Structure formats: C-alpha cells, structure tokens
C-alpha cells in the first residue's frame, strides 16, 4: 500500500510538473498569438485608413473631388468645405551623388471650385553645401485639363506638363485588403505608422508606372504605406504611398504619391 501511495504521489507530482509546463507553453503561445493579432490589427488599421482615399482611385476626372467630402476635425473653420491636395513625384538617380525628380502638386479648393498648383523639376546633391536646383511652373485645372500659367519655351516640357497624369488618375487598389504580412513600423509617440509590401512586377499599378516613367531597375518594387498623424484620421498629418524600385546609390528610383483632405489655407475663399 505504501508503495502504491508513493507511486501515485510521484505520478501526481509528475503530472503537475507537466501541467505547469504545459500552462507555461500555452501562455507563451497565447502571448505570441496576442502579439501577432496586435500586429495584424495595426496592419488592418493602416490599410483601412488608406482605403478611405485609395478606394477613390482611379480618379478619372479630378474635378470630381470638388464634390467629395473628406475627414473633418476641429481644425476646420466654420463654413470651410476644405481643400483636396493631390501630388505625384518621380525621382531617379541618373548620376552618382545626384537625384533628379519631377512631379506635380494640385490644390483643389472645394469652396471656390478652383484648382492651382505647380509642376516642379528638382535636382538634389549628396555633396555638402551644394544647393538644390529647383524650377516651379504654375498650373491650374480647367475642365479636367492641366493648363500652364507660365511660359515654357521647351515644347517637350510643355507637352509633358500639359499631359501630366497623377498616379491617382490611373492607379487601382481594389486588392488592398488582400495585401498580407506587411513589414510594420510604428511609433505612437510621433505618431507615425508604416506598412511595407513587396509587389510583383505583374501588378497592374507597377506595370503602369513602368510604362509612364524611365524605370531601369528590373527587380520587384517595395510599396510603402506611410501615415504621419493619428491613424484614425487627422487633418494635421498626411498619408503617402511610395514605390521603391531601387535603393542602389547610382540607380535609386522611387515614386511617391498622396491624396489628402484638409482645411483651406488662408480662409474659405482663398
């Protein structure tokens, strides 16, 4: 009898050790799962935050934005319908130590139903002290067409500006919700949030970018979704997408694009 008691006691202790160990493993697994869910949750929040504007792509007629409402907060003055800002910029390093970029920004005032902006050509240098070269050409939007307000002698440049298309006019993000396992970077003190995805060259948006720009890099690009500000919405911060085709110093290539809604600067009628 004493032998059986000792045996049962020993078995009970062993079972308890196994159970405690099992509970520890279960807790570890739960922690891992909770951490995964937390990461997935932020990833979903980032995508949902972007979907509020990317679901509008492609915007065939930019003047449709005059009738589109965006996120509003206490930064808006009474009666201000707000202003949409759309921008697309392409940058490429064509020489060691230099980065050339061209792009356009357009501000669409919903109060006055007018849109003005700039086409910018810029060269920046790695060399300390060497000043950035930049030239801005004023533009406006009339009947969904870009109209130059400055005289441009170069016919090729004039044609390029007048026929410029923002990425948002031909991009399509209907599959955004299917993007998975992104590389997530978060700093809630700033705050900012980023999700990065490797996108295949067969992707429709990537194909269109390669058609429209002199992209020589062959490898698949990285798509970055960047939020600066409250992930739930803010008129102070901004959201930007960026396709990086190459980070090689002599062939660095990327395209950045954003569509944001905010208070009209200077007043409702400016």
Curated annotation (Swiss-Prot):
* Bridged cysteine pairs (disulfide): none
- Subcellular location(s) per record: Cell membrane
Where in the sequence is the signal peptide annotated? 1-22
Q: Which domain of life is it from?
A: Bacteria
Say where the lipid (N-palmitoyl cysteine) is covalently attached. 23
What is the membrane topology noted in the UniProt record heading this document? Lipid-anchor
What keywords are assigned to this protein? Cell membrane, Lipoprotein, Membrane, Palmitate, Signal
Q: What GO cellular-component annotations does this UniProt entry give?
A: plasma membrane
Quote the Pfam families the UniProt record gives.
DUF576
- Residue positions of S-diacylglycerol cysteine lipidation? 23
Question: Which family does the record assign?
Answer: Belongs to the staphylococcal tandem lipoprotein family.
In Swiss-Prot or TrEMBL terms, this protein is called Uncharacterized lipoprotein SAB0396
> What organism is recorded for this protein?
Staphylococcus aureus (strain bovine RF122 / ET3-1)
């Amino acid at each position: 009898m004493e032998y059986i008691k000792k045996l049962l006691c020993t078995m009970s202790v062993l079972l308890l050790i196994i159970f405690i160990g099992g509970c520890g493993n279960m807790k570890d697994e739960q922690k891992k799962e909770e951490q995964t869910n937390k990461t997935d949750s932020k990833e979903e929040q980032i995508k949902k935050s972007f979907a509020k504007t990317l679901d509008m792509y492609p915007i065939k007629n930019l003047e449709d934005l005059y009738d589109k409402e965006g996120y509003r907060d206490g930064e808006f003055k009474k009666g201000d319908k707000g202003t949409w800002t759309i921008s697309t910029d392409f940058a490429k390093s064509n020489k060691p130590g230099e980065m050339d970029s061209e792009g356009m920004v357009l501000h669409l005032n919903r109060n006055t139903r007018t849109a003005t902006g700039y086409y910018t050509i810029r060269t920046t240098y790695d060399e300390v002290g060497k000043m950035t070269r930049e030239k801005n050409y004023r533009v406006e939007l009339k009947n969904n067409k870009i109209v130059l307000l400055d005289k441009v002698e170069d016919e090729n440049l004039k044609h390029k500006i007048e026929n410029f298309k923002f990425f948002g006019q031909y991009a399509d993000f209907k599959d955004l919700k299917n993007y998975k396992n992104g590389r997530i970077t978060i700093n809630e003190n700033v705050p900012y949030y980023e999700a990065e995805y490797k996108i295949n060259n067969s992707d429709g948006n990537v194909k269109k970018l390669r058609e429209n720009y002199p992209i020589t890099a062959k490898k698949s690009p990285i798509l970055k979704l960047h939020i600066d500000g409250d992930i739930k919405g803010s008129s102070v911060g901004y959201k930007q997408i960026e396709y990086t085709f190459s980070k090689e110093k002599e062939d660095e290539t990327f395209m950045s694009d954003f569509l944001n809604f905010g208070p009209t600067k200077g007043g409702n009628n400016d």
